[in-house]
């Protein structure tokens, strides 16, 4: 039973880490996947239980407030605070919209901004965009199509004091 539980955990971890096995290319990972003893019912349950009802609401509200630039086929969404995986879920969904080739989804926490970047065009490397957005004010990185990062609010305000104060004034007037 312990080996089956461990096999189930390893199988599901590999499933999630390889984008549902679509990015499974390492022969060792492939061999492990084929040799694991796992609970298929548990895997099915895990696959279909990825977010809570609250996270669904956060994602839905965020997607209603999408900012889109038609010239660059680029979208930006500001989300309520949530797990970084939900930011990725929103980004993945947004990239499925016709005409959206690159997107950034972000939210604020007590010390800064978490963000998720997606791109499906060769002209925009998600990891490079993530690095660019956080350069000198946080950290970012990932893969060619999917990346993420964090921006320190303190470092952002120090580097861009005018932008921050203008944004704060604009935001205050909107309320």
Where in the sequence are the language-model features?
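Nucleotide-binding motor/catalytic cores of P-loop/tubulin-like NTPases across gene-expression machines
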Residues: 111-132
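Glycine-rich, small/acidic residue-mixed loop/short-helix segments
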Residues: 141
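Short amphipathic beta-strand starts and helix->beta connectors
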Residues: 98-102, 130-137
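A structured phosphate/pyrophosphate-recognition subdomain
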Residues: 1-113, 118, 145-146, 150-168, ...
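A short glycine/serine-rich beta->alpha loop
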Residues: 19, 137-138
């Amino acid at each position: 039973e312990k080996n089956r539980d461990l096999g189930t955990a390893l199988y599901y971890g590999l499933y999630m880490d390889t984008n549902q096995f679509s990015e499974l290319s390492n022969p060792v990972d492939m061999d492990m996947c084929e040799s694991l003893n796992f609970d298929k019912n548990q895997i099915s349950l895990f696959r279909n239980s990825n977010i809570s009802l609250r996270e669904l609401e956060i994602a839905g509200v965020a997607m209603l407030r999408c900012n889109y630039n038609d010239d660059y086929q680029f979208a930006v969404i500001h989300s309520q605070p949530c797990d970084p995986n939900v930011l990725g879920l929103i980004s993945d969904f947004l990239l499925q919209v016709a005409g959206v080739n690159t997107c950034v989804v972000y939210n604020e926490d007590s010390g800064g901004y978490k963000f998720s970047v997606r791109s499906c065009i060769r002209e925009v490397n998600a990891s490079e965009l993530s690095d660019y957005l956080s350069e000198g004010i946080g950290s970012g990185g990932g893969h060619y199509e999917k990346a993420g990062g964090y921006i320190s609010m303190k470092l952002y305000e120090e580097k861009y004091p005018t932008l921050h104060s203008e944004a704060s004034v604009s935001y205050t007037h909107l309320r």
